[in-house]
Amino acid sequence: MAESNTDSKSSNQMWGGRFASGPDAIMEEINASIGFDKKLFAQDIRGSIAHATMLAHQGIISAEDKDKIVHGLNTILSEIESGNFEFSRRLEDIHMNIEARLATLIGPAAGRLHTARSRNDQVALDFRLWVKEELEKTEKMLTGLIAAFLDRAEEHAESVMPGFTHLQTAQPVTFGHHCMAYVEMFGRDRSRVRHAIEHLDESPIGAAALAGTGYPIDRHMTAKALGFREPTRNSIDTVSDRDFAIEFLAIAAITGMHLSRLAEEIVIWSTPQFGFVRLSDAFSTGSSIMPQKKNPDAAELVRAKTGRINGSLIALLTIMKGLPLAYSKDMQEDKEQVFDAAESLELAIAAMTGMVRDMTVNTARMKAAAGSGFSTATDLADWLVREAGLPFRDAHHVTGRAVALAESKGCDLAELPLADLQAIHPDITDKVYDVLTVEASVASRKSFGGTAPSEVRKQIAFWRARN
């Protein structure tokens, strides 16, 4: 699919009737979008076929011209897909490139295709179709990522690890429970994707430049043919806004944020200092100078791509924020942001799905870490509330003294002699040691949504039924 700049005067054949001369070379360069909007060729052709079919059905063009147009458009589709189509920058965009080639193939009948249509509603349609398809693809990819986490959660429903706050040891949890946290996050992301598909499921074609058209078109017919629920209801809004693209970018940014947090954890967990997980060779790289290195580059690149996605969201919001209704050429700058973010998001989800499925979990290292840092201190406080009848604030204070004592002795809470604990509070008995193991700690957290293995398995079953 080569690009050419050599076809002189072709740039104004579609719209240049009132112009005495062609545009300056710099104007051609800044005005051209074919370098990136050629990605919309399939959507543009699909929309044109639906439009031509409707025009013929309504008696606006002849059936003979419609057949020529459809045959010509299918020929162009084959040319582009096979790499035998030469794109021209002087023809500005994908719409003009296809229409010019159609005129070469079928002659004057090509000029009837643009009846009751503007490039304003045409590009709104193409872009909306592309974003809709991308959202559907994202939904499927998120479903795959959720499935990968469900498998790991089931495998590790009882594997104890430290839970963190402030990246400091907080309480024991299970790795399965930690995995299910990401199932919830990516599940919400997928829900946002589904809602976005509902929001954009309206056909723009037929809005024309901004005011609609005087031709007796059937917008419901084209909407149905293109797989939309219904046509848009306001022609000015139809060509004015790109909130469907911004919503896609916002979803991509939120999803990217979740991916980035996970990537950060994988980077930390894979360090020798943590040693919780080991990435497979398939998702790691080495060093050109240090032979021993195995770097988590896939995770780091997922983390970085989130920055690109965030930048795309801010860019499009900034482009749109000051535009009066209806269409302005500023909106030509909408597509590159979305195309780039979509590519980054696809790569990030695919890479993360592979890492989650392939990584090796060091359960022994996780369990050992879970028992350090006085992670069962809350369990001691809860025991004092239940068994000694202390108010929680008093129990919290007593436990704090026990932690300070254990820290001064260089031991864990469970290693403190009973006499030492009773010196802090006389109602402590030897039964307290039953709650100071990490296994007992996680098993006790049976509240809805808690980390107890039994509760984790309930949540896995809930999500498997919905994934």
Swiss-Prot record:
Kindly state which keywords UniProt assigns to this record, in alphabetical order: Amino-acid biosynthesis, Arginine biosynthesis, Cytoplasm, Lyase
> Which reaction(s) does its UniProt entry say it catalyses?
2-(N(omega)-L-arginino)succinate = fumarate + L-arginine
NCBIfam families reported in the protein's UniProt record: argH
* Signal sequence residues: none
* Principal EC category: lyase
- What broad class describes the main subcellular location of this protein? cytoplasm
EC assignment: 4.3.2.1
Give the protein family.
Answer: Belongs to the lyase 1 family. Argininosuccinate lyase subfamily.
What is this protein identified as?
A: Argininosuccinate lyase
Subcellular location, record wording: Cytoplasm
Q: Gene3D superfamilies per the record?
A: Fumarase/aspartase (C-terminal domain), Fumarase/aspartase (Central domain), Fumarase/aspartase (N-terminal domain)
Q: Which GO terms describe its molecular function?
A: argininosuccinate lyase activity
Which InterPro entries does this entry report, sorted A to Z?
Arg_succ_lyase_C, Argininosuccinate_lyase, Fumarase/histidase_N, Fumarate_lyase_CS, Fumarate_lyase_fam, Fumarate_lyase_N, L-Aspartase-like
For this protein, the record's HAMAP family field holds: Arg_succ_lyase (MF_00006)
> Which organism is this entry from?
Rhizobium etli (strain CIAT 652)
* Alphabetized SUPFAM superfamilies for the sequence: L-aspartase-like (SSF48557)
GO cellular component terms, A-Z: cytosol
What Gene Ontology terms for biological process does this UniProt record contain? Answer: arginine biosynthetic process via ornithine; L-arginine biosynthetic process
Q: Keyword Lyase on this protein?
A: yes
- A Pfam family name for this chain? Lyase_1
